[in-house]
Amino acid sequence: MSLLTTRAPAKINLTLHVLGRRPGDGYHALESLVAFAEVADTLELLPGRDLALEVSGPTAGPAGPLDDNLVLRAARHLAAGVDGLRLGAFRLHKQLPVAAGIGGGSSDAAAALRLLAELNALALDHPAVIAAARATGADVPVCLDPRARMMRGAGEEIGPVLELAPLPAVLVNPGVPVSTAPVFKALGLAVGQRLDGAEHPGVAAGLDADAVLGVIAPARNDLEAPALTVAPVIGEALALLRAQGGCRLARMSGSGATVFAIFSDTAAAQAAAGAVRVAQPGWWVEPTRLA
């Protein structure tokens, strides 16, 4: 069979409400409206007998040891659940920053599962595919079919596709990797403790851009404040985006350090990206659309 290819887009938390810390397992219970960007890693699979991975691209260096890569971890989980699973050699081209709050590794893992599902004629809702996604990481299930939807719990509750209008946006990462654990530690919730705050607004399917902004503007990312104590440069990135013409909303994604801003139109987003690149030439800056 010939080479298979798919994209692994950045996952953006348009909202991220932390409801509390669950008494049973200690995980943080979340509600998040998730969208996906046009900017992405690329994953290829050359079918063959042995499982292998090669990583290249501008952010390949920080991606860590190959044996621990989520692409291989996801493939191994699926192979454990499907007898005789056909495998092969993966080639991952890394464009997305690592430890950045945009689910790059999770999206890569989900891309691997999509390619293996295609190779083995498995549906994405096949129990073994879902189980492999959950076993690989909390954000992997929502990345299997990368379209806007609600995510709840510790990532295991995935809502239906919302078919939201594309949002012109700019993604900015100030080049500081941020691990999730220190951010949740800074949030400081004890097991069983709930976090005060307004409930997440309801999100209807098929909203246009103005309606999406109307939903997410009064919402929040509850990890933004603790992340600022871990990496204060996040605040600089947010301020720089908010100063750009046409910026309608700027917020951190995930546990950081990537931030995003939604703009009035594509031209404004392109202009803002150019201005941020001039102001901070060492930062990762990408104009894109979120949907």
UniProtKB/Swiss-Prot annotation:
It catalyses: 4-CDP-2-C-methyl-D-erythritol + ATP = 4-CDP-2-C-methyl-D-erythritol 2-phosphate + ADP + H(+). GO terms for biological process: isopentenyl diphosphate biosynthetic process, methylerythritol 4-phosphate pathway; terpenoid biosynthetic process. Pfam families: GHMP_kinases_C (PF08544), GHMP_kinases_N (PF00288). Signal peptide: none annotated. Pathway: Isoprenoid biosynthesis; isopentenyl diphosphate biosynthesis via DXP pathway; isopentenyl diphosphate from 1-deoxy-D-xylulose 5-phosphate: step 3/6. The active site is at K11, D139. ATP binds at P97, V98, A99, A100, G101, I102, G103, G104, G105, S106, S107. This is 4-diphosphocytidyl-2-C-methyl-D-erythritol kinase. The gene is ispE.
